[in-house]
Amino acid sequence: MKLHELKPAPGARTKPTRRGQGIGSGMGKTAGRGHKGQKARSGGGVRPGFEGGQMPLQRRMPKRGFTNRFKKEIIAVNIEKLNRFENGTTVTPEALLAARVIKKTGDGVKILGNGNLEKSLTVQAHAFSSTARQKIEAAGGRAEVI
């Protein structure tokens, strides 16, 4: 078989249906739109979410809450994730970002106390939970608020 002998698979190249091209095509006269009505007209059709005059779902659902424009996004990191750093290292939010422990620093990083810490580290973060602070100091490290 050579390149010039290649043929597309049967049924792979179908011609587009030409609507409104006579009754013999099967898509003549009304071109698949039925008779009259809003959807038969040029440019006709209902807007998204329209339910025929019935109160639409979006308006039937109650309004709830609001979006706080001043919210702070604090990134939480559990203490067990800090074991990947070498003994005696200073762990900063930038170091966590570089090590891909977190995807972004947001408005601050908070260290939480889930898991165990086997390394002695100096951890710098914007906030610490009480258990995280205890575990860092129990492992011989320091917890510094920045």
UniProtKB/Swiss-Prot annotation:
Domain of life: Bacteria
Biological processes per GO annotation: translation
InterPro entries referenced in this protein's UniProt entry, alphabetically: Ribosomal_uL15, Ribosomal_uL15/eL18, Ribosomal_uL15/eL18_sf, Ribosomal_uL15_bac-type, Ribosomal_uL15_CS
Compositionally biased spans, kind Gly residues: 21-31, 42-52
Location of the region described as Disordered in the Swiss-Prot/TrEMBL record: 1-66
Disulphide connectivity of cysteines: none
Protein purpose: Binds to the 23S rRNA.
Name recorded for this polypeptide: Large ribosomal subunit protein uL15
Species the sequence originates in: Pelotomaculum thermopropionicum (strain DSM 13744 / JCM 10971 / SI)
Name of the coding gene: rplO
